[in-house]
Regions:
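Divalent cation-coordinating acidic motifs and surrounding scaffolds
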Residues: 34, 81, 94-98
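Extracytoplasmic "Venus flytrap"
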Residues: 44-69, 78-91, 109-112
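Flexible loop/hinge segments that line or gate small-molecule binding clefts
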Residues: 121-154
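Short, well-structured alpha-helical segments in soluble
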Residues: 87-102
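Hydrophobic alpha-helical segments within soluble ligand-binding/sensing domains
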Residues: 153-169
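Periplasmic-binding protein-like
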Residues: 101-109, 127-131
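Sec-dependent N-terminal signal peptides of Gram-positive bacterial secreted proteins and lipoproteins
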Residues: 2-25
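Bacterial lipoprotein signal-peptidase II cleavage site
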Residues: 18-39
Length: 169
């Protein structure tokens, strides 16, 4: 009985947290996606890693989130797939997005850590989101250096594992 009660409480708390985190603005109005400077649409770009945009993993999940922002917030979205998987390949596509006016760039995965480390310095007026990684120089024992124009997001996989364990108990 305790396990069922605990599972129910955790499910309610998880649902409430998700709904609160995904809720709209407090005034009930949707954002238009404008940058506010010239009425231009915000341009959100993504660089894929070695996978494809429909890989049922980080690339697909990231792109679907950007597409939702495009639909709900009116942002302009674009993704580029590098020709290779080196830091230089990633930096080239980051530069291509930047040159096309995409100053909000999302990269899915730790493979982008060194490219974002360099990109955040080179493109100081751009904003970067690095999923499941932290920018660093690539040197041995390098410490993460998240610039003021970068957000590094790590998923709390241990929480999902805990919830799965509770659910099966």
């Amino acid at each position: 009985m305790k396990k069922k009660f605990l599972s129910a409480v955790l499910a309610v708390l998880t649902t409430a947290t998700l709904l609160a985190g995904c809720g709209g603005s407090s005034d009930g109005q949707a954002s238009s996606g404008d940058t506010g400077s010239k009425g231009d649409k915000m341009k959100v770009g993504m660089v894929t890693d070695a996978g494809t945009i429909d890989d049922k993993s980080f690339n697909q999940g990231t792109w679907e989130g950007i597409q939702k922002a495009e639909k709900d917030l009116g942002v302009e979205a674009k993704y580029l797939k590098p020709s290779g998987t080196t830091e230089a390949d990633y930096l080239k596509e980051i530069g291509n997005l930047y040159d096309a006016g995409f100053k909000f760039i999302v990269t899915p995965g730790f493979k982008f850590e060194t490219a974002i480390y360099k990109g955040q310095e080179k493109y100081k007026d751009a904003k970067f989101v690095l999923l499941d990684g932290a920018p660093h120089s690539g040197a041995k024992d390098a410490k993460p250096e998240v610039g003021p124009n970068t957000v590094s997001i790590f998923f709390a996989e241990e929480q999902a594992g805990f919830m799965a364990g509770v659910a099966t108990a």
